[in-house]
């Protein structure tokens, strides 16, 4: 069955060394049957997830924090009753997965994720990374965890390959100190500086790779 990613929108505000990010992604079940899907979101080990919301048609499902086993039980019950449901879990310090149950043919699923992240520096350079897909660096199975690594089979794009669907990202940056330079190693970007320490960064109109 086909469940392609149609659109990704990322809005990030960086104040000092804290980045607050809102991610919205849209998928559509283009198959002929109901499906259960697994959504994999790679992130740094310094990420804290604050909220997740899923919209399927007119139905809105908002995540609530539960003990792991209790959450799994509630998810399986909803799944067995044919209800749309989702379960967000942290599989590793840097990988979150969300299981989505009973997505009907033609349904469009909109997922909203809200998280904050501590930005670290290396040699005086601060780097913010938003991964478009999971890849080998995020999904390397280890022998001691081989029984828990089924999720690592998630497909990924080779370096330099454009992600599926439309993609845009906007970063509002307030550093508190003068910004010496702003660059992207992956994409061509457009930078608008409001002052020495405040800037707005978006992808260039072409969305080309750097």
Language model segments and positions:
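Subset of Sec-pathway N-terminal targeting signals
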Residues: 1-210
């Amino acid at each position: 069955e086909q469940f392609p990613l149609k659109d990704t929108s990322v809005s990030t505000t960086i104040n000092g060394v804290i980045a607050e990010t809102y991610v919205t992604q849209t998928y559509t079940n283009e198959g002929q049957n109901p499906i259960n899907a697994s959504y994999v979101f790679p992130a740094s080990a310094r990420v804290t997830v604050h909220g997740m919301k899923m919209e399927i048609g007119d139905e809105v499902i908002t995540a609530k924090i539960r003990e792991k086993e209790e959450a799994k039980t509630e998810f399986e019950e909803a799944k067995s009753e044919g209800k749309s449901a989702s379960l967000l879990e942290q599989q590793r310090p840097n990988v979150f997965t969300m299981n989505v149950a009973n997505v009907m043919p033609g349904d469009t699923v909109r997922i909203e994720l809200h998280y904050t992240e501590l930005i670290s520096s290396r040699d005086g350079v601060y780097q913010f990374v938003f991964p478009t897909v999971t890849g080998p660096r995020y999904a390397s199975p280890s022998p001691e965890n081989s029984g828990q690594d089924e999720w690592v089979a998630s497909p990924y794009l080779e370096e330099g390959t454009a992600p599926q669907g439309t993609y845009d990202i906007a970063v509002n940056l307030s550093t508190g100190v003068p910004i010496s330079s702003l660059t992207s190693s992956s994409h061509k970007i457009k930078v608008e500086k409001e002052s020495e320490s405040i800037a707005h960064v978006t992808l260039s109109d072409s969305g080309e790779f750097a």
